[in-house]
Amino acid sequence: METDKRWSLAGKTALVTGGTRGIGRAVVEELAKFGAKVHTCSRNQEELNACLNDWKANGLVVSGSVCDASVRDQREKLIQEASSAFSGKLNILINNVGTNVRKPTVEYSSEEYAKIMSTNLESAFHLSQIAHPLLKASGVGSIVFISSVAGLVHLSSGSIYGATKGALNQLTRNLACEWASDNIRTNCVAPWYIKTSLVETLLEKKEFVEAVVSRTPLGRVGEPEEVSSLVAFLCLPASSYITGQVISVDGGFTVNGFSYAMKP
């Protein structure tokens, strides 16, 4: 394969959920800059329109629709819209949408449990399931789940959130094996604290940021573009032999054990 084709998404199609903020927006822009035609969604029409106008002004080929990914019939409508936009074929599915409620396990309500599960896990499973025919029809498919290091190690971000992310990590491995014969690769990206709206309130607290940084070997919080670059790579032809992997983007957090500088 020619080098330029290995590092290009020209002619490819992509669906990115939750693409108007944070990591999702960075992924939309990254894929579009590599040449992909992208469709994304948001629950907020005004926010979506503002993004679409901005992308158009910057020469990026992006379309969009309103969708609450936690609602089953809206997910089905989203896939129908993507199918119509891309003539029944989809090369890339990025399951990015997510939410969280931070509180002790004993304080969660059944409604909060259902909301986090339906948004983070059920949406990703169902969208992958109903997008499968489109991914298979494209001849070369790639799914990327946006998980979290909370699915790998304990964080105080909440047990339900961690459970959904751990499930995504295993779903990645299962689909990678089950759908390999359909030429669909499945991978997962697990970020640590990234500057997004999901955690912006936390990152406004100096003591919290200092605690995060103290456990992060690279000594800082991550940027959305540092996640989207890996997501894009996992969709490129250059990554064609990579599947079933859960890759942390965490500044070294998950490999940081105990260290203590001994005084002479």
Swiss-Prot record:
Superkingdom of source: Eukaryota
Annotated PROSITE patterns: ADH_SHORT
Database matches in InterPro entries: NAD(P)-bd_dom_sf (IPR036291), Sc_DH/Rdtase_CS (IPR020904), SDR_fam (IPR002347), TR (IPR045000)
Catalytic center residues: Y161
Top-level enzyme category: oxidoreductase
Chain residues that bind NADP(+): 15-39
Its EC number(s): 1.1.1.-
Protein residues bound to substrate: S148
Family classification: Belongs to the short-chain dehydrogenases/reductases (SDR) family. SDR65C subfamily.
Protein name (record): Tropinone reductase homolog At5g06060
